A protein has these predicted regions:
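Hot-dog-fold acyl-thioester-processing enzymes
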Residues: 1-82
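Mid-chain, well-packed structural core segment of small domains
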Residues: 71-95, 99
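Short, surface-exposed, polar/charged, turn-prone segments marking secondary-structure boundaries
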Residues: 44-45, 53, 80, 87, ...
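A short acidic, glycine/proline-enriched capping/turn motif at secondary-structure boundaries
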Residues: 58, 65-66, 86, 92, ...
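Generic structural detector for well-ordered beta-strands
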Residues: 17, 84-86, 139-141
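HotDog/MaoC-like acyl-thioester-processing domains
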Residues: 1-2, 90-145
Length: 145
């Protein structure tokens, strides 16, 4: 059982240089045909300084391996339950973003195969000047046992 005392625990900040190759590969992997994520000329023609990341790209920047390990989740099965995104502006190739993750909530739910834990993580990404770029709220379901 996850302890509610985890609520409020924050990760160390991690800084990411957003690369155009990462944006392009992500767009291709999810089948996003948006030329702003695939074609630099199209992105520049639309007024951006580089490729524009698809909306769900921010998830790849948060919830670091080190933070997951610090929560001591063990080897339980983890199911991605829900996700929401808020953007102050698009993520663009060349951005240098600092991301922090925080445990927003820990809940217990009854499942068909027994009790399970629900873990809610909030990621926040900020630009080099400290400006908010995005927030991601993710819900994970963890089977016990």
């Amino acid at each position: 059982m996850l302890e509610r005392s985890l609520i409020g625990r924050e990760s160390e900040p991690t800084t990411h240089e957003v690369e155009k190759g990462a944006i392009r590969r992500f767009a291709e992997a999810i089948g996003d045909p948006n030329p702003l994520a695939l074609d630099e000329a199209a992105a520049r023609a639309a007024g951006f300084s580089g490729l524009v990341a698809p909306p769900t790209f921010a998830f790849t920047l948060g919830w670091s391996e080190r933070f997951r390990h610090s929560l001591d989740l063990g080897t339980r099965s983890v199911l991605h339950g829900e996700q929401s995104f808020e953007y102050a502006r698009p993520i663009v190739a060349g951005d240098r973003l600092t991301v922090r993750s925080k445990v927003a909530d820990v809940l217990e739910r009854a499942g068909a195969s027994g009790p399970m834990d629900v873990l809610v993580i909030e990621d926040e990404g900020r630009g080099e000047k400290g400006d908010l770029v995005f927030k991601v709220r993710s819900t994970f379901i963890l089977r016990r046992g």
